[in-house]
Amino acid sequence: MKCFDFDESVQKVLNDSFSDIEPTNWKSWLEISSSEEFEELCLKNSGLSSVNEIFKRATSEITDSRSFSINLEKFLSNYSQSYTPIVCHTSGTTNSKISALKWFFMSKSVIQRNWAPGMQAIFESSGLDSKSSAVIFVPSRVKLDGLQYYEEQPFISLYSSEFSQRVMLSIIKPKAYTFYEYKNSKHLDVISKIFDLDDIMVISAPALTILGWADLEKLTLQIQKSLEDLPNYKNPILENLISMIKKEGIQKASKIIQEKLSEKLSKATIIFSISSLSEQNWNLIRRFMKWEKGKERFTNLYVASEIGPFASSISKGDFEISRQNRLYVFPLTLAAIEHHNKKQLISRASNKTGKLLVSRMDGSEALINIDLGDIISIKENKGLPQIDGKIIRSSFKLKYDLKFSDKFTIPFDYNIYAGDFFSLNDFIINQPRNLINCLKNDCNLEVDALLLLKSNKQSWDLVFPSNIHENCLKEKKIIELISSCLHQEELTQGIINNLINIAFIDDQPVDFLATRSEILNKVREGQAPKGILKKWPLYVIIPKNDENTLI
């Protein structure tokens, strides 16, 4: 296997531990024809078939993921198994401190039952096999990641996104691959490694990486910057690229490199999430990948640190389910949804939208209804269930501070909530990003986050910046936009009935304490987890003495 890997030592440990895992016949999942068959396979694959009254428990119990997370130091001091332990950590969405991350032990049984089959299905359905190559990019590591030592004993720590793809490499064993961090995707040395691969069938990278290649200005800037940071040993391809830049100049050479990269990757399938892609960005990606509209080749996926690969738009090659933005639920765990405190298995659910709860085994212990904090929508639950590819985050309490405008008054003692879905006593707010997009399109508003403030026991303030088109500086217009963009009658009526006051201020309502570039540098240097980069569309402030407002 030809590999260009920024950490081959970690991959070697995973290969030694997991390369003998038997492959799964994931194509048979697509032949599942009934809910009963799906449930039976879920119980068999997950190991939950041995759990008494599993269906009853799956409609009544719930598990906080922190209850089975590990104290890293305590776990390592007591570890006694013969193989190198591997731990994965969360992305730090709720807390910006590395010390606050949740850690999970990746036991061999969990990898065999959940991670290996799911990742094999995702990549093989995208076209990767032992005769083809893969281009893979992963998040910048935190400072604790990689092959580490505790009291002279080795252990491996990784984001689940890096771990999952390294497990996949151990199982599928492609003939060649590149494996680097997102931040180096436009580095000339990394590009030269991609040029050294043949038969590239899969690119696993976020949309921003592809867009970075597709944007010639950004690509040129980063290629030029990377010339100051080239390795001492330069492979022949890299030497040729450097010579071309010297001869043609950076602008012309970057254009040639972009065209070669586009051609090199044009037969590949991209594995990425498409939820946040605008049509403009889609067009950039189509042009770079040489795709016709309606003939895009990509695979969407949903993987969580607590449970592994849960769903993906796997297929037998037509990618139609991907283009519909749907995902098949893998029969590797037992999943339920919770709607208004009622829990139902997704294979039996009458309610089609709710909070995702997933049951799996952890060694000999059954973890029933792990609360992942995400909201899913079921599109089909006869046979192999299908869910909407847009997974939204239920509201959660932030554990780091933000900067609020001094143009309004906030409570003395309060909590901050963020997310995509807020269930409040008097109304629900679902996908507020849609409202921001409408404000940008209809009102020329330059804002990426709004603020909802509980101003007193009876009412709220929904705060907007006033640097918008004058036609939008009216409550009536805001009501129209909320009605047309969010389709949430309770919220609209709340404004009409003065439960929610519309407030305009000559300032941005909310922002990070540091600049975006400062935070990004911290993440890239491993000083902060990547979750801190997420700017949520809505932040909600609730006084601590009024916490029962959020349900």
Task: Describe each PLM feature range.
Residues V87-T94, S276:
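Conserved helicase ATPase motor motifs in RecA-like P-loop NTPase domains
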Residues K2-F18, S170-I551:
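Active-site glycine/GP-rich loop and adjacent strand/helix microenvironment
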Residues A100-K102, S157-L158, E162-N184:
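Short beta-strand->loop structural element characteristic of the AMP-binding/adenylate-forming
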Residues L101-S109, N114-P117, Y149-E152, K218, ...:
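"Short basic amphipathic alpha-helical interaction patches in structured regions
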Residues Q112-S132, S185-D198:
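Conserved ATP-dependent adenylate/AMP-binding module captured primarily in the ANL superfamily
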